[in-house]
Amino acid sequence: TFDELLTEHGSGRGCEICKPAVASILSSCWNDYVLKTELAPLQETNDYYLGNIQKDGTYSVVPRVAGGEITADKLIVLGQVAKDFNLYTKITGGQRVDLFGARLEQLPDIWERLVEAGFETGHAYGKSLRTVKSCVGNNWCRYGVEDSMGLAIRLEDRYKGVRSPVSYTHL
């Protein structure tokens, strides 16, 4: 564990350079749910709370929208959650909807509503795959020659949550 590593080789809680590297290596070794009680100390605050801390101390929440494809019902849920918690919304460059302004104590309630609607974390905070971007492909585009949406969704579903030393995005 990270605590055992510190006991043997260091002190403190880990710097911004060593902690993510050690977290990536150890997470790869046991490939388990990273928020288990014994594994949680490895996680940065953003990973632990599934929110990205902003300069004003609030958090942004970024649900996964594989390939940028989302149903009308899920859009309604995002809008209702944003309205109920007074969150600012923005379409990201990664084809997702980012919800800004959540207080730390609101995150469990926000995620409960999102998970109930079928969302999961978009890992916009962790060191893992964030998003696979796609055009609409041959499903809608007259110039499309392949099912790029289907491929993007399959790639994102296959690699979501896989830990790495840095975050990455498939284009």
Which residues make up each language-model segment?
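Short glycine-/aliphatic-rich beta-strand segments at the starts of folded cytosolic domains
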Residues: 46-68
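Compact, charge-rich alpha-helical regulatory domains located at protein termini
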Residues: 1-12, 16
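Helix N-cap motif at beta-to-alpha junctions
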Residues: 102-107
